[in-house]
From Swiss-Prot:
It comes from Homo sapiens (Human). Interacts with CDC42 (in GTP-bound form). Interacts weakly with RAC1 and not at all with RHOA. It is a lipid-anchor. InterPro entries: CRIB_dom, CRIB_dom_sf, SPEC. Keywords: Cell membrane, Cell shape, Cytoplasm, Cytoskeleton, Lipoprotein, Membrane, Palmitate, Phagocytosis. One of its GO terms (biological process) is phagocytosis. Residues 63-72 have a biased composition (Basic and acidic residues). One of its GO terms (cellular component) is cytoplasm. The CRIB domain mediates interaction with CDC42. This is CDC42 small effector protein 1. Residues 19-24 are annotated as: Mediates phosphoinositide-binding.
Length: 79
């Protein structure tokens, strides 16, 4: 009898787990923004193609002057 179970065990292979399908996100799953503070606009004229990222420092300085830097969501690192 034990020989039967031994032979049966070598033929039974564990099936791989099916991959979980990612749920598609729709509008009902997204809430309103929290703690949103509008600081400034950056338009295409302000960040010209010739300037590259040279204007980044000026934009950062403008954003710093707009409000409190001690917010919990504030990032102290530069771009």
């Amino acid at each position: 009898m034990s020989e039967f179970w031994h032979k049966l065990g070598c033929c039974v292979v564990e099936k791989p787990q099916p991959k979980k399908k990612r749920r598609r996100i729709d509008r009902t799953m997204i809430g309103e923004p929290m703690n949103f503070v509008h600081l400034t606009h950056i338009g295409s004229g302000e960040m010209g193609a010739g300037d590259g990222l040279a204007m980044t420092g000026a934009v950062q300085e403008q954003m710093r002057s707009k409000g409190n830097r001690d917010r919990p969501w504030s990032n102290s690192r530069g771009l």
